[in-house]
Amino acid sequence: LFADLEGSTPLSRRLSTASYFSLARRLVRASDRCVIEAGGLVGRHAGDGVVAFFLAETCGSESAAARACIGAMRDLRGAIGDVAAASDLTPDKLTLRFGLHWGSTLYVGGITTSGRSEVTALGDEVNEAARIEACATGGRTLASKTLIERLDADDAAALDIDPDRMSYSVLGELSTADEKARRDAPAVAVCEL
Protein backbone atom coordinates (compact mmCIF):
# COMPACT_ATOMS: atom_id res chain seq x y z
CA LEU A 1 0.00 0.00 0.00
CA PHE A 2 1.32 3.39 -1.01
CA ALA A 3 -0.65 6.48 0.04
CA ASP A 4 0.11 10.15 -0.31
CA LEU A 5 -1.62 13.44 0.42
CA GLU A 6 -2.29 15.29 -2.82
CA GLY A 7 -1.59 18.99 -2.97
CA SER A 8 0.47 18.93 0.20
CA THR A 9 2.95 21.57 -0.96
CA PRO A 10 0.30 24.26 -1.60
CA LEU A 11 -1.45 23.23 1.62
CA SER A 12 1.79 23.58 3.59
CA ARG A 13 2.14 27.11 2.22
CA ARG A 14 -1.41 28.11 3.18
CA LEU A 15 -1.13 26.80 6.75
CA SER A 16 1.31 27.94 9.38
CA THR A 17 4.30 25.63 9.72
CA ALA A 18 3.10 24.49 13.15
CA SER A 19 -0.41 23.79 11.83
CA TYR A 20 0.89 21.84 8.86
CA PHE A 21 3.22 19.82 11.08
CA SER A 22 0.29 18.98 13.38
CA LEU A 23 -1.74 17.92 10.34
CA ALA A 24 1.08 15.69 9.09
CA ARG A 25 1.43 14.16 12.58
CA ARG A 26 -2.32 13.41 12.71
CA LEU A 27 -2.21 11.87 9.25
CA VAL A 28 0.79 9.69 10.16
CA ARG A 29 -0.91 8.52 13.35
CA ALA A 30 -4.14 7.73 11.48
CA SER A 31 -2.31 5.81 8.77
CA ASP A 32 -0.28 3.84 11.32
CA ARG A 33 -3.41 2.97 13.28
CA CYS A 34 -5.31 1.82 10.18
CA VAL A 35 -2.41 -0.28 8.89
CA ILE A 36 -1.59 -1.89 12.24
CA GLU A 37 -5.24 -2.63 13.09
CA ALA A 38 -5.58 -4.36 9.70
CA GLY A 39 -2.54 -6.55 10.44
CA GLY A 40 -0.05 -4.72 8.26
CA LEU A 41 3.45 -3.38 8.79
CA VAL A 42 4.21 0.31 8.41
CA GLY A 43 7.24 0.52 6.18
CA ARG A 44 8.04 4.19 6.20
CA HIS A 45 6.68 7.69 6.04
CA ALA A 46 7.84 10.29 3.57
CA GLY A 47 6.35 13.54 4.82
CA ASP A 48 2.61 12.99 4.55
CA GLY A 49 2.88 9.69 2.66
CA VAL A 50 2.97 6.14 3.94
CA VAL A 51 4.22 2.81 2.64
CA ALA A 52 2.79 -0.32 4.26
CA PHE A 53 3.08 -4.04 3.70
CA PHE A 54 0.52 -6.80 4.26
CA LEU A 55 2.19 -10.18 4.34
CA ALA A 56 0.49 -13.49 3.65
CA GLU A 57 2.60 -15.04 6.43
CA THR A 58 1.27 -12.70 9.11
CA CYS A 59 -2.26 -12.25 7.74
CA GLY A 60 -2.82 -16.00 7.25
CA SER A 61 -3.09 -16.21 3.46
CA GLU A 62 -2.62 -14.22 0.28
CA SER A 63 -6.34 -13.49 0.23
CA ALA A 64 -6.33 -12.29 3.83
CA ALA A 65 -3.35 -10.03 3.10
CA ALA A 66 -5.09 -8.52 0.05
CA ARG A 67 -8.28 -8.03 2.10
CA ALA A 68 -6.29 -6.38 4.91
CA CYS A 69 -4.62 -4.01 2.44
CA ILE A 70 -7.93 -2.93 0.92
CA GLY A 71 -9.50 -2.68 4.38
CA ALA A 72 -6.69 -0.46 5.67
CA MET A 73 -7.08 1.81 2.64
CA ARG A 74 -10.81 2.13 3.27
CA ASP A 75 -10.27 2.78 6.98
CA LEU A 76 -7.69 5.47 6.28
CA ARG A 77 -9.93 7.08 3.69
CA GLY A 78 -12.67 7.13 6.36
CA ALA A 79 -10.32 8.63 8.96
CA ILE A 80 -9.53 11.65 6.78
CA GLY A 81 -12.65 13.46 8.01
CA ASP A 82 -11.41 13.26 11.60
CA VAL A 83 -7.91 14.39 10.61
CA ALA A 84 -9.39 17.33 8.70
CA ALA A 85 -11.72 18.33 11.54
CA ALA A 86 -8.89 18.20 14.09
CA SER A 87 -6.90 20.45 11.75
CA ASP A 88 -9.78 22.94 11.25
CA LEU A 89 -10.09 21.93 7.60
CA THR A 90 -12.98 20.58 5.58
CA PRO A 91 -12.49 16.98 4.36
CA ASP A 92 -12.33 18.14 0.73
CA LYS A 93 -9.05 19.92 1.56
CA LEU A 94 -7.37 16.57 2.34
CA THR A 95 -7.22 14.26 -0.63
CA LEU A 96 -5.35 10.98 -0.36
CA ARG A 97 -4.38 8.92 -3.35
CA PHE A 98 -3.65 5.21 -3.00
CA GLY A 99 -1.74 2.62 -5.00
CA LEU A 100 -2.36 -1.00 -4.00
CA HIS A 101 -0.25 -3.79 -5.46
CA TRP A 102 0.81 -7.37 -4.82
CA GLY A 103 4.36 -8.64 -4.89
CA SER A 104 5.11 -12.33 -4.61
CA THR A 105 8.88 -11.93 -4.95
CA LEU A 106 9.44 -9.15 -2.43
CA TYR A 107 12.11 -9.31 0.19
CA VAL A 108 10.77 -7.60 3.31
CA GLY A 109 13.00 -6.88 6.27
CA GLY A 110 14.14 -4.41 8.86
CA ILE A 111 16.95 -1.92 8.50
CA THR A 112 18.44 -0.28 11.56
CA THR A 113 20.95 2.55 11.37
CA SER A 114 22.09 4.88 14.14
CA GLY A 115 19.20 3.92 16.39
CA ARG A 116 16.59 4.33 13.66
CA SER A 117 14.63 1.29 12.50
CA GLU A 118 12.53 0.93 9.37
CA VAL A 119 10.75 -1.90 7.58
CA THR A 120 11.44 -1.94 3.87
CA ALA A 121 10.88 -4.14 0.87
CA LEU A 122 12.95 -4.76 -2.20
CA GLY A 123 11.66 -5.86 -5.57
CA ASP A 124 10.19 -4.60 -8.81
CA GLU A 125 6.71 -4.61 -7.29
CA VAL A 126 7.72 -1.85 -4.86
CA ASN A 127 8.58 0.49 -7.74
CA GLU A 128 5.40 -0.55 -9.52
CA ALA A 129 3.30 0.22 -6.43
CA ALA A 130 4.84 3.69 -6.21
CA ARG A 131 3.99 4.30 -9.87
CA ILE A 132 0.42 3.07 -9.36
CA GLU A 133 -0.02 5.51 -6.47
CA ALA A 134 1.42 8.40 -8.49
CA CYS A 135 -1.17 7.76 -11.23
CA ALA A 136 -4.10 7.73 -8.77
CA THR A 137 -4.65 11.47 -9.03
CA GLY A 138 -7.80 13.16 -7.84
CA GLY A 139 -7.97 11.15 -4.64
CA ARG A 140 -8.48 7.87 -6.44
CA THR A 141 -7.45 4.39 -5.38
CA LEU A 142 -5.86 2.25 -8.06
CA ALA A 143 -5.37 -1.44 -7.34
CA SER A 144 -3.43 -3.87 -9.47
CA LYS A 145 -5.03 -6.88 -11.08
CA THR A 146 -2.53 -9.09 -9.26
CA LEU A 147 -3.79 -7.78 -5.90
CA ILE A 148 -7.49 -8.13 -6.76
CA GLU A 149 -6.94 -11.68 -8.03
CA ARG A 150 -5.46 -12.72 -4.68
CA LEU A 151 -8.93 -12.35 -3.09
CA ASP A 152 -10.83 -15.58 -2.55
CA ALA A 153 -14.61 -15.58 -2.91
CA ASP A 154 -15.30 -14.97 0.80
CA ASP A 155 -12.85 -12.08 1.19
CA ALA A 156 -14.01 -10.50 -2.07
CA ALA A 157 -17.64 -10.73 -0.94
CA ALA A 158 -16.77 -9.22 2.45
CA LEU A 159 -15.24 -6.25 0.60
CA ASP A 160 -18.16 -6.08 -1.86
CA ILE A 161 -15.77 -6.66 -4.76
CA ASP A 162 -16.44 -9.02 -7.64
CA PRO A 163 -13.04 -9.78 -9.20
CA ASP A 164 -14.70 -11.28 -12.28
CA ARG A 165 -16.49 -8.00 -13.02
CA MET A 166 -13.53 -5.66 -12.56
CA SER A 167 -12.45 -3.66 -15.58
CA TYR A 168 -8.74 -2.95 -15.90
CA SER A 169 -6.60 -0.37 -17.67
CA VAL A 170 -2.91 -0.60 -18.46
CA LEU A 171 -0.98 1.83 -16.25
CA GLY A 172 1.30 3.11 -19.01
CA GLU A 173 -1.71 4.13 -21.10
CA LEU A 174 -3.48 6.18 -18.40
CA SER A 175 -3.60 9.92 -18.98
CA THR A 176 -2.08 10.36 -15.51
CA ALA A 177 0.95 8.15 -16.27
CA ASP A 178 4.19 10.06 -16.09
CA GLU A 179 7.56 9.10 -17.52
CA LYS A 180 8.41 6.94 -14.49
CA ALA A 181 5.13 5.01 -14.74
CA ARG A 182 5.65 4.40 -18.45
CA ARG A 183 9.24 3.30 -17.77
CA ASP A 184 8.81 1.20 -14.59
CA ALA A 185 5.29 -0.22 -14.84
CA PRO A 186 3.89 0.26 -18.34
CA ALA A 187 2.04 -3.08 -18.53
CA VAL A 188 0.66 -3.29 -14.98
CA ALA A 189 -3.12 -3.72 -15.14
CA VAL A 190 -5.04 -1.57 -12.63
CA CYS A 191 -8.63 -0.86 -11.68
CA GLU A 192 -10.21 1.86 -9.62
CA LEU A 193 -11.63 0.96 -6.22
PLM feature segments, named:
Residues 9-32, 43-44:
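Conserved long alpha-helical elements within nucleotide-processing catalytic cores of c-di-GMP signaling
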Residues 1-10:
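Catalytic-site or vestigial catalytic-site microsegments of nucleotide-handling domains
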Residues 8, 50, 59, 147-148:
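A generic structural signal for short hydrophobic patches within well-formed alpha-helices
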Residues 106, 117, 128, 137-193:
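Intrinsically disordered, glycine/charged-rich C-terminal tails and inter-domain linkers
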Residues 20-27, 68-72, 76, 125-128:
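Hydrophobic alpha-helical membrane-association signature
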Residues 3, 34-67, 82-124:
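Catalytic core of nucleotidyl cyclases, primarily class III adenylyl/guanylyl cyclases
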